[in-house]
């Protein structure tokens, strides 16, 4: 397997489950092994119902995927087929050179790497392999994953540079904001207002929060570039409409209204 960043060369157990095939999966298989195959088939555009039952339809989709990738069309998911299915995830786990990078620029490079693979939910709200990777093995409606995505990127950047993260990280927006305050890195929207306000000291990459109240934030992501009236983002669990319950990692432009930041 290609090199990875997290876990000092060894993948955390919840990621191992997503990218390591213990035995071939074929027609008749049930449960998570079948589900993962179905999820990745759907991710790659081979649509089918995700029901954790490897039946005739799943076998047919596997054969179509194998044919498209120049593999033998057995309809059985062996190691070679599985590696092709999970290739986008393996790609984002591949270390990026740390040369000439600060922490904030390293964060930006990893965020771009994830964006290029277009992670998205598969099989329902907050479901699928990408969500489980960002959320330490959890998925489902009760696991919004925007903060998990941010934390995962920060961990990759910190481990690549051999440094401690500026904040601990969390799967909760409110916890991330609290950590930023405790570290003295939190910047309120109010500091951007007024005649003497400036955005020039914002880092190339920072964490942004969508604020509902002074103690409640509903969404978070990475701010990647700043302009006078708007900033650019890479964020998870959102969509082109900017919903806090979206379905993908995407890049957006946002205004500063009701936004706070953690400086990186």
Provide a role label for each language-model segment.
Residues 27-34, 51, 55, 59, ...:
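Solvent-exposed, acidic/flexible segments
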Residues 246-264:
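Low-complexity, Gly/Ser/Thr/Pro-rich intrinsically disordered linker/tail segments
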Residues 57, 101, 105, 160-243:
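...with weaker cross-activation on analogous glycine-rich loops/strands in unrelated enzymes
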């Amino acid at each position: 397997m290609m090199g990875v960043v997290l876990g000092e060369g060894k993948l955390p157990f919840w990621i191992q489950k997503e990218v390591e095939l213990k035995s071939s999966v074929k027609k008749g298989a049930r449960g998570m092994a079948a589900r993962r195959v179905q999820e990745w088939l759907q991710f790659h555009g081979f649509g089918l119902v995700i029901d954790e039952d490897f039946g005739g339809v799943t076998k047919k989709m596997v054969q179509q995927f194998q044919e498209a990738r120049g593999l033998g069309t057995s309809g059985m998911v062996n190691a070679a087929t599985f590696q092709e299915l999970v290739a986008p995830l393996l790609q984002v786990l591949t270390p990026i050179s740390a040369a000439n990078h600060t922490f904030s620029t390293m964060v930006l490079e990893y965020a771009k790497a994830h964006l290029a693979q277009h992670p998205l939910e598969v099989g329902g709200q907050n479901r699928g392999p990408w969500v489980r990777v960002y959320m330490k093995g959890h998925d489902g409606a009760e696991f919004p994953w925007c903060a998990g995505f941010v934390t995962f990127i920060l961990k990759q950047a910190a481990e690549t540079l051999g440094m401690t993260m500026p904040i601990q990280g969390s799967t909760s927006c409110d916890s991330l904001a609290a950590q930023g305050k405790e570290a003295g890195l939190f910047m309120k929207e109010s500091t951007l207002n007024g005649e003497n306000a400036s955005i020039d000291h914002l880092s190339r990459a920072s964490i942004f929060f969508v604020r509902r109240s002074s103690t409640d934030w509903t969404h978070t992501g990475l701010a990647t570039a700043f302009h006078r009236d708007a900033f650019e983002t890479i964020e998870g669990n959102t969509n082109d409409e900017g919903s806090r319950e979206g379905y993908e990692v995407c890049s957006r432009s946002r205004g500063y209204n009701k936004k706070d930041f953690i400086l990186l």
